[in-house]
Amino acid sequence: MAQTMTPSSITDGQKEEEPILRCISEGENLVIPATDGKALISEEKDVFKVWIDPDFLRLDANEPSNPTPEAVPRVYEMERDTTFEHMFDSVCKDKDKICWTQSQIIGFVQKYPNWLHPEGWATFFPFKSKGNFFVAYVFWYGPAWLDVFVG
């Protein structure tokens, strides 16, 4: 199943009878380093060596952020099919609280490639750019084989 990430341990979403997501990083010591906010996915050809979706530029999903402090991410695995809206709402209704910066996404991918879903499934990272909500889909095909799409 696909995985999704949040940059902090926010859990104010409503419970459902059949959970949408299951946290698989509980008890792990994952830490995203502080960032200066300047790194952009569209410019990280050394990280995403297979493909960087040109829609990052076409959709104007290419905005630097403010610097961010160290963050403790949570990694979730999807338990059932759903929409992005329902999936992210199950973690937190306030999407601003679960959004990553592009610098944080890059930092996580570089530091924790083993937490990206193998076997051709995407790992989803919610982020905002210029007031719009996007999802970065990161695919890991093995060491040095990453690509990223935006939707």
What are these regions (language model features)?
Residues M1-I98, Q102-G151:
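A binding-site-centric feature that preferentially detects glycan-recognition modules on secreted/surface proteins
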